[in-house]
Structure formats: structure tokens, C-alpha cells
């Protein structure tokens, strides 16, 4: 199977597999390192490509919307998807790193590797909204530099988001299009459920992140209290008042307190579920069948 050259946004949407893996080479015609490593990417595609593992290329100058949504800031950048969700990124023309990354994902695609994938906790009838998030505009106040918000959106089980000077976090999540948000899934850090969020306040359609002072003075769209985590390393699904989250272009999550009144709050993984509004999708969704 050859490398697919993405020609339009709709072509991009149709290329991302709902079930399986995707490796994307984000390049520019003027980029020397891009040209140097391009033959290797093609060789890897010839070796590993299958119906479960697709290889594609995106010209960042011609497909700016796609590049922006992927968070590409330098070339070349290689982006990897699992079941319609972005799971990893590799920046720079590093042949050995690219070989290792592709080989690892291939082992997951064929089910032969020790890290064979498991899907995230499903919300039946709805889809993960991770592909609809405008990643470059994500923001979190009071996060630790080494444990920032991006740590809660990747697939690395050892990474996590942690607050800094106290237990509170202010998370701003903008979307590439208007969505309906049905539920939030929060996974605690293994063995540290006491540091997981207990009370959260949600605010929709804010143009920017809120300050902690503003959040106290604004009326939340919904307040969720006394969150209970049955397993310390598994997602807890928190259904929202769906009628209040029908047209959402951004979501602010104010982590107000944690379960054990710990000094800092920790989140292993954060995921949103819902569906897009209208027929024009700007992000790839993975539907979870009932």
C-alpha cells in the first residue's frame, strides 16, 4: 500500500480510520529535512501499511486547516492516530526514532506487541471529541511545567496533569467546530484517587480561559460535586445535563477541589464524549456502537 497524499479537508476526514492506526507525515516543499526523510517514510509504508495501519502525507502550506488542528509547529512532524484519535507526535527528521515509532504501532495494529491497544472507556451512542479539540489553543492555569494539560490528552499511562501551588486547575478546551458534549471521562493516577477531582464547575462558550477570580463570580453551566472513582486507574464517566451542552464551541473545566483534600490535584487522562452539530465535521470522531 502506498502513502496517501491528502488533497483536501474532506479527503483528510475520510482517510482517518475509525478502527485502526494512521501515521501522517506533515511536510513542506521548501523543507530540506522533510525531503531527506520522505523516502524512509515511503519505505516504512511499503513494509508496514495494511488496512489497519494507513500512511498519509499532508503538505502544511496547502492544508493549513489540517496542520493547525494537528498542532504542527515545525517540519517535518509525524502524527499518529489510534481509532480516530491523535495519540502521539514526533518532531524532526530522526530516522531511528521514526522507525521505532512505526514498528511499535505496527505491532499494536497486528496485535503482536506487548502494548497492544485497548480502547478508551466507551460512552455508548456517542463519540470521543478528542479529534475536534483545537489543540494549539488548549490552556490550563496553575499546572506544573512537567505535568501539563497535554499529559492528560495523550496515551502514555505514566504521564499525568498536576496542579501547582494548590489543588485548583482552570482548563480551557476550544473546539474546531460546534459540538454537543454528553459526558466527561476522568481517569485518576494509579494509587492516587485521593488526588483526583471531587468538585468541578463547567462553563461553556467562553472566548478565552477564565481567571480563578472570574470563575468565582460567573454562574457555571453546571456544577458536579462528590465525584466517586470506583477504580483508581480506570475512567469514571460523568454524564452532563445534556440539554445545557447542545451548542458548545469551548469548554472551561474548573477543578475546584480533590477527593482527599490533597495539596495538588492529579489527572491521568481526560476525555470528552458527544457529537458534532451539523453536517460539516472539522474533526474526526470515533463512534462507539451501542
UniProtKB/Swiss-Prot annotation:
Gene Ontology molecular function: protein-disulfide reductase activity
GO CC annotation: cytoplasm; cytosol; nuclear periphery; nucleus
Biological role: Has a role in cellular detoxification of alkyl hydroperoxide.
Keywords for the protein's UniProt record, in alphabetical order: Cytoplasm, Disulfide bond, Electron transport, Nucleus, Redox-active center, Transport
Annotated Thioredoxin domain residues: 24-104
Cross-referenced CDD domains: TRX_family
Highest taxon in the source lineage: Eukaryota
One GO term (biological process): proteasome-mediated ubiquitin-dependent protein catabolic process
Protein name: Thioredoxin-like protein 1
Disulfide topology: 31-34
Signal peptide: none
Species for this entry: Schizosaccharomyces pombe (strain 972 / ATCC 24843) (Fission yeast)
Residue ranges constituting the PITH domain according to the UniProt record: 118-290
Cellular location(s): Cytoplasm; Nucleus
Pfam families for the chain: PITH, Thioredoxin
Amino acid at each position: 500500500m502506498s502513502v496517501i497524499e491528502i488533497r483536501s479537508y474532506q479527503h483528510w476526514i475520510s482517510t482517518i480510520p475509525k478502527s485502526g492506526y494512521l501515521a501522517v507525515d506533515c511536510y513542506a516543499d521548501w523543507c530540506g529535512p522533510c525531503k531527506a526523510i520522505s523516502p524512509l517514510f515511503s519505505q516504512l509504508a511499503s513494509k508496514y501499511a495494511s488496512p489497519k495501519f494507513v500512511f498519509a502525507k499532508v503538505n502544511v502550506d496547502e492544508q493549513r486547516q489540517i496542520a493547525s488542528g494537528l498542532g504542527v509547529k515545525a517540519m517535518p512532524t509525524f502524527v499518529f492516530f489510534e481509532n480516530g484519535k491523535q495519540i502521539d507526535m514526533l518532531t524532526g527528521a530522526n530516522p531511528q526514532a521514526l522507525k521505532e515509532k512505526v514498528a511499535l504501532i505496527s505491532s499494536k495494529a497486528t496485535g503482536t506487541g506487548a502494548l497492544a491497544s485497548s480502547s478508551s472507556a466507551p460512552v455508548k451512542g456517542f463519540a470521543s471529541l478528542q479529534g475536534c479539540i483545537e489543540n494549539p489553543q488548549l490552556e490550563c492555569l496553575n499546572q506544573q511545567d512537567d505535568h501539563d494539560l497535554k499529559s492528560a490528552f495523550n496515551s502514555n499511562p505514566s504521564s499525568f496533569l498536576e496542579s501547582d501551588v494548590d489543588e485548583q486547575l482552570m482548563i480551557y478546551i476550544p473546539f474546531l467546530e460546534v459540538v454537543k458534549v454528553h459526558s466527561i471521562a476522568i481517569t485518576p493516577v494509579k494509587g492516587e484517587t485521593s488526588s483526583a477531582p471531587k468538585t468541578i464547575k463547567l462553563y461553556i462558550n467562553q472566548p478565552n480561559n477564565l481567571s480563578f477570580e472570574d470563575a468565582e463570580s460567573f454562574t457555571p453551566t453546571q456544577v458536579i460535586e462528590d465525584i466517586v472513582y470506583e477504580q483508581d486507574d480506570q475512567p469514571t464517566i460523568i454524564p452532563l445535563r445534556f440539554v445545557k451542552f447542545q451548542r458548545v464551541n469551548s469548554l472551561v473545566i474548573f477543578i475546584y477541589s480533590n477527593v482527599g483534600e490533597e495539596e495538588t490535584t492529579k489527572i491521568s487522562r481526560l476525555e470528552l464524549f458527544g457529537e458534532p452539530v451539523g453536517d460539516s465535521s472539522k474533526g474526526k470522531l470515533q463512534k462507539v456502537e451501542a
